[in-house]
């Protein structure tokens, strides 16, 4: 297995929920998470939790919908950590539930900007920092946190389901280009079902049927520590406590 020790990993949306759980996992394994979040206070709170537990982390104000900000954050991280910056987790996501007749232009645009454009902006800038001319002992890692909603259908979720389906296809494109162009990077896809995070509060699901964020964070750590000759093309994680395909 590939060690996490000494690796710097940029995580979007790491100020709470799943992103925070991923950052804590990576830090506990010896990595240095760069906690990206549009909420400065939330990012600093995650860093403080990690440092209080004996790990290392740093905050970064990150608006994934702004390609200029994304470029600045990625370049600053690359300048600070050099070759040890070899991990990206596209975790930031948003959901503004509304039916087809009620969803506003602003709601639609906001969800697609975070869930679809954000991973593209971040992945593009991250891949541009990799020196493809030099051999690497281990490939870099990109984990796209998609959602089981990419392959399910739910009422009042047109924007979210559509954006996640688009991210699933983008992940396939990234995987194909990484292979055909010989990039020193692995692109992993992850489709979790409902987790007990603040974003799920609007759907009023029972806590008993949702997964703990740390369960999915463990899957992210697993992907990033696989031997260099393998990657996770697409991993669906579902709760056994909910029949069928929950949100």
PLM features per residue range, with description:
Residues 8, 15-16:
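Conserved glycine-rich cofactor-binding loop
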Residues 40-41, 61-73, 105:
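The beta1-alpha1 cofactor-binding region of Rossmann-like NAD(H)/NADP(H)-dependent oxidoreductases
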Residues 99-100, 104-112:
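Substrate-binding pocket helix/loop in short-chain dehydrogenase/reductase
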Residues 101, 152-158:
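Active-site loop immediately N-terminal to the catalytic Tyr-X3-Lys motif
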Residues 123, 163:
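Active-site helix of classical SDR
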Residues 147:
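Residue(s) in the substrate-gating loop at a strand-loop-helix junction
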Residues 185, 189-190, 205-245:
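C-terminal helical subdomain
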């Amino acid at each position: 297995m590939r060690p996490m020790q000494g690796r710097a990993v940029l995580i979007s949306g790491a100020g709470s929920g799943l992103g925070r759980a991923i950052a804590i996992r990576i830090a506990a394994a010896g990595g240095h998470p760069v906690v990206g979040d549009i909420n400065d206070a939330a990012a600093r709170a995650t860093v403080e939790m990690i440092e209080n537990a004996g790990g290392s982390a740093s905050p970064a104000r990150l608006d994934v919908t702004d390609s200029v900000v994304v470029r600045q954050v990625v370049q600053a991280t690359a300048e600070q950590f050099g070759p040890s910056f070899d991990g990206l987790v596209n975790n930031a996501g948003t959901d503004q539930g509304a039916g087809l007749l009620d969803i506003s232009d602003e709601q639609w645009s906001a969800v697609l900007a975070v869930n679809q454009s954000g991973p593209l902006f971040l992945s593009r800038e991250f891949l541009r920092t990799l020196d493809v001319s030099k051999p690497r002992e281990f490939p870099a890692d990109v984990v796209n946190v998609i959602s089981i909603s990419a392959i399910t259908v739910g009422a009042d979720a047109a924007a979210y389901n559509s954006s996640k389906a688009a991210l699933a296809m983008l992940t396939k494109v990234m995987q194909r280009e990484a292979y055909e162009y010989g990039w020193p990077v692995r692109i992993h896809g992850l489709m979790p079902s409902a987790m007990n995070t603040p974003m799920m509060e609007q759907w009023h699901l029972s806590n008993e049927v949702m997964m703990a964020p740390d369960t999915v964070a463990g899957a992210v750590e697993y992907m990033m520590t696989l031997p260099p000759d393998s990657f996770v093309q697409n991993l669906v994680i579902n709760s056994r406590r909910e029949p069928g395909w929950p949100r």
